[in-house]
C-alpha cells in the first residue's frame, strides 16, 4: 500500500466512510483474481459510494487509460457485492487519484474522473486548518492526518 493510498483511505475513514482496502475481486478458477480494488468507501448518511485508484506512476495517459478502464470496470461489476445487505447507491463515484500529472487534457479516465494529489491536499487542509489541535485534535489512529493538522496550525512558521 502506497502513501497516497493510505492518505486517501484514512481521509475517507476520518469523515465517516466505511472503507475497504486492497480488495481482491473476481476469483479465477485457476487461481488468482481478476482485479484488486485499492480503496472503496461508503458513507451511509450521504449515500455516497466511491472507488479510488491512487497511483504515483509516471506512465503515459494511454497506459493509464488501459489500466483504469480495467480497474473501474471491475469496480462497477463487483463493488455492490462488497456491501451486501447495505443500501448502497447504484452510481459509483470512481476517481483516479494521481500524484503526478495534470488533468488539463485528461479530466476523465477509464470511465472515472481524474483527481490530483494537490486536490486531495486542498480538501484535507481546508477542513483541518479550521480545527485547533487544543480543542479538536485529529485522533492518533490517523497519524498522517494528524501530521497535516499540526502543519496547518503551524503554517506561518513553516512558510519561512
Q: What residues fall within each predicted segment?
A:
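Intrinsically disordered, low-complexity Ser/Thr/Pro/Gly-rich regulatory segments
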Residues: 1-160
Amino acid at each position: 500500500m502506497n502513501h497516497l493510498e493510505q492518505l486517501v483511505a484514512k481521509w475517507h475513514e476520518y469523515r465517516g466512510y466505511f472503507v475497504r482496502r486492497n480488495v481482491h475481486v473476481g476469483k479465477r478458477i485457476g487461481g488468482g483474481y481478476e482485479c484488486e480494488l485499492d480503496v472503496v468507501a461508503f458513507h451511509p448518511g450521504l449515500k455516497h459510494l466511491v472507488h479510488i485508484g491512487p497511483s504515483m506512476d509516471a506512465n503515459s495517459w494511454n497506459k493509464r487509460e488501459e489500466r483504469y478502464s480495467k480497474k473501474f470496470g471491475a469496480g462497477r461489476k463487483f463493488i455492490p457485492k462488497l456491501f451486501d445487505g447495505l443500501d448502497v447507491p447504484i452510481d459509483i463515484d470512481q476517481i483516479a487519484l494521481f500524484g503526478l500529472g495534470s488533468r488539463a487534457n485528461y479530466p476523465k479516465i477509464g470511465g472515472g474522473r481524474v483527481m490530483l494529489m494537490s486536490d486531495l491536499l486542498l480538501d484535507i487542509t481546508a477542513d483541518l486548518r479550521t480545527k485547533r489541535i487544543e480543542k479538536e485534535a485529529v485522533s492518533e489512529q490517523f497519524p498522517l492526518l494528524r501530521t497535516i493538522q499540526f502543519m496547518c496550525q503551524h503554517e506561518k512558521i513553516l512558510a519561512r
